[in-house]
């Protein structure tokens, strides 16, 4: 299967125009899109360890959720040089789908909404990020699901008692900033995401929003595993996971 055919398939599932402005999605490294791909590796991050593993495993197309470069850089030295050197010397194509994969139908946020069987789920933000709906059950049942499928030891900021059948917001990855806490406090009773800070915790307590930090990694990898299964069932090539 050619690299360009894989990219076309991914972009049909997670259209690039869904990505939020400034998100560095799409082809990251590589130029021969007519190359025949024999093994695809999938990972959350294009870390040096992931790229080294891709080389070791004979991966020739590396898909990552997070892009290789987020901010503009002025030179290619240190770790970024090491990453590029391995990718280019081994002719490994690197491709990323980030917020477009978060937002798209059956993407990472829909995977969380489906896990909790949210009633009437809708996008949490106008740009399509996150999901919010009614969780039909108790807070304890919600935590049991979280611990079983997402993270065994989530951080729970229980700012108030939660009635059954509560409004639950979910957002895969980084969602527990102070601005997000303030926004979601007007939308939901409970908020599951990742990357809680000390000041966000205090703000959640003050606003009466129950927050569950199941980590950036775990809230995204749950849906990424589903995406890997989807690719495996639709693409005629070997697909392996590299960091989950």
Curated annotation (Swiss-Prot):
It comes from the Archaea. Keywords: DNA-binding, Metal-binding. SUPFAM superfamilies: NIF3 (NGG1p interacting factor 3)-like (SSF102705). One of its GO terms (cellular component) is cytoplasm. Signal peptide: none annotated. GO terms for molecular function: DNA binding; metal ion binding. A divalent metal cation 1 binds at residues 65, 102, 220. A divalent metal cation 2 binds at residues 66, 216, 220. The keyword DNA-binding applies. The keyword Metal-binding applies. Belongs to the GTP cyclohydrolase I type 2/NIF3 family. DNA-binding protein exhibiting the ability to bind to both single-stranded and double-stranded DNA. Homohexamer; trimer of dimers, that forms a hollow cage-like architecture. This is GTP cyclohydrolase 1 type 2 homolog. It comes from Methanocaldococcus jannaschii (strain ATCC 43067 / DSM 2661 / JAL-1 / JCM 10045 / NBRC 100440). The lineage of its organism: Archaea, Methanobacteriati, Methanobacteriota, Methanomada group, Methanococci.
